Amino acid sequence: AVHLCDVGAGAGFPSLPLKIMNPQMKITILEPLNKRVVFLKEVCREIQLDNVECLNVRAEDYAKEHRESFDLVTARAVANLRVLSELCLPLVKKNGIFVAMKGAAGFEEQAEAEKATKILGAELEKAEEVHLQDGSARVNLTYRKVRTTPPQYPRAYAKIKKSPL
């Protein structure tokens, strides 16, 4: 079964809808805000979703012991892609996929993050603009992990934020 990690899941998007559509999928949610973790655990209990682990932890801390252990990592509305890629790509298995769900500025972020994603071992596989019913644009960036992430990444969050790759 596919093992998905959702970084900064917030209210559970996209991980919970993906789990509902793919019941065999194993989900690990990393969420630094405990009140969101409590909410997500309650939602999973209420709608009887099994094989969903909701953890109150930061991605860069979790990655220390769970490097390259996920087939698919998703993130939506977490951080700028230069920061986000360092939080997420160390978690992705070699040949796995990282999907960054970005706003309308996604293409600009992708260009700015090109060096970072390369250093971290990923190549852009697809950049897709989608339009919501209200007319607003979103950009989904899909990366394939082609090389192992160098062991010094991810750095501490303060370092990532202060000097993104």
Locate each region found by the language model:
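Conserved beta-strand signature within the Rossmann-like core of class I S-adenosyl-L-methionine
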Residues: 95-105
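Helix-to-beta-strand junctions that scaffold the AdoMet/dcAdoMet cofactor pocket
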Residues: 22, 92-94
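Short glycine-/small-residue-rich Rossmann-like dinucleotide-binding loops
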Residues: 77-78, 103, 147
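Short "lid" loop at the C-terminus of a central beta-strand within the Rossmann-like core
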Residues: 60, 103-107, 131
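Residue-level signal for inorganic ion chemistry
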Residues: 18, 102, 143
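SAM/dcSAM-binding transferase cores
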Residues: 111-165
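Short alpha-helix immediately C-terminal to the canonical SAM-binding loop
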Residues: 36-38, 106, 110
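Conserved SAM/SAH cofactor-binding pocket of Class I
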Residues: 1-79, 85-86
